[in-house]
Amino acid sequence: MRRINTIMQGKTNGGNGPESGTVVVTRTQPKTRKPSLYRVLLLNDDYTPMEFVVHVLQRFFQKNLDDATRIMLHVHNHGVGECGVFTYEVAETKVSQVMDFARQNQHPLQCVMEKK
């Protein structure tokens, strides 16, 4: 936070008593930072079906069929692919949802997050 001091001179209550003189008013201005962003990544494996990966991308990352297919092929060909960029809490939730869903469907799909 940044502090700003404002000095005001004058008389209060119109007299020469203890109420007259200089008044210092301190105001603080909050300094906000943008939150750190995290990439959510899918990792390739030899067992998870491509259709399941596309379904995950559509369900948890709201990707259309073309984008989901493109990302899935990138994961397949390069070993890793980015699903999206989110704040820490959102990225953590997405990773957890994907991992739970993969386990429920008995697939070894791995999803991780890394700071951008």
From Swiss-Prot:
Q: Where is the composition biased (Polar residues)?
A: 1-11
Q: Which Pfam families match?
A: ClpS (PF02617)
* Residue numbers spanned by region Disordered: 1-23
| Gene3D superfamilies linked | 3.30.1390.10
Classify the source by domain of life. Bacteria
| InterPro entries hit by this protein | ClpS, ClpS_core, Ribosomal_bL12_C/ClpS-like
Any one GO biological process: protein catabolic process
Free-text function comment from the UniProt entry: Involved in the modulation of the specificity of the ClpAP-mediated ATP-dependent protein degradation.
Supply the HAMAP family for this chain.
Answer: ClpS
Q: How does it assemble?
A: Binds to the N-terminal domain of the chaperone ClpA.
* NCBIfam families xrefs: PRK00033.1-2, PRK00033.1-5
Q: Which family does it belong to?
A: Belongs to the ClpS family.
Please identify the protein, giving its name as recorded. ATP-dependent Clp protease adapter protein ClpS
Q: Which organism is it from?
A: Brucella canis (strain ATCC 23365 / NCTC 10854 / RM-666)
Query: Which gene holds the coding sequence for this protein?
Result: clpS
